[in-house]
Amino acid sequence: MTLRIDNRIIETVEEATLSLIIETEDRAPVTRVLNGKQTSAKQYGPDYSTAYWNLKLIIDLENDDECAPNFWTPVDGATFPAQLSQLSGTRLIVTDQTEATYGTHGPALDETVLELGDWLSPEAVLVRWTAEYEDWYSKPTQRLPFSFEGAVIFSGIEMRVKREEDATPILSHVLPMLDQSAFVMSLGRQIELGPLVQAEPTTLARSLLAT
C-alpha cells in the first residue's frame, strides 16, 4: 500500500477496509393518526434502504492523530453488476451525498476520485484514491495532494435488520442485479433495543463473498 499526503510517502497504514453498507432506515413523511398532521419519522424496509461504499484507512502517525481518511458515497443500484469482479476498473460515483474527509476533525478531501482495480481474492481488491485538501495549518492556506493506492480488505455487505428474513428482500431491492448465490450470510450479535423505542431486536447481518 502506498499513501501520499502532502507529497510525503506514509508507510504506517495499519489497515485499509472497503465495505458495502446497506442503510435499512430513512426519514420519510408520515401522517399522525391523532391529529392528521404530517411529519417525518424513521421508516424501515426495502423502500427506505440505500447502499453505500465506505473506505476507511487506519494510520498511526506520531504527530497526526487526526489523520484517518474516510470515504463514503452512495451506490447506483440500477447499474450494480451481478458479480463483484465485474466492478474492476469502475470509478465510484461522487454525488452531493459523498463524504470524504482527512480525519474525524480534519478537512474535507475535495476532487475525490476512487477507482476499483482487480480483485485479488473474494476478500481483497486493489483501489486507487486521489484527492486534495486544504492545509489548515499553513500560512497562507495551501491545497495539498492526497493519494492512496494498494490492496484493501473487503469486509463484505453489512446491514442492520430487525428480522433475519429481511436481509434477502432488502438486498434484492437495493442491488437488484446482484447474484446473491455468490454470498454466504453471517449473522452478528442481537441488540435489544428496549421498550422505549418499541422495536424488535436488531440483528447485524453480513454477507461475504464466498470463495
Model-derived segments and spans:
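Acidic, glycine-rich flexible loop segments
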Residues: 83-153
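Intrinsically disordered, low-complexity terminal/linker regions enriched in Pro/Ser/Gly
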Residues: 160-211
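Short beta-strand-to-coil "C-cap" segments at the C-terminal boundary of structured domains/repeats
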Residues: 23, 151-158
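Residues in flexible loops and secondary-structure boundaries
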Residues: 124, 156, 160-162
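An ectodomain-focused feature that recognizes extracytoplasmic/extracellular
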Residues: 1-104, 189-209
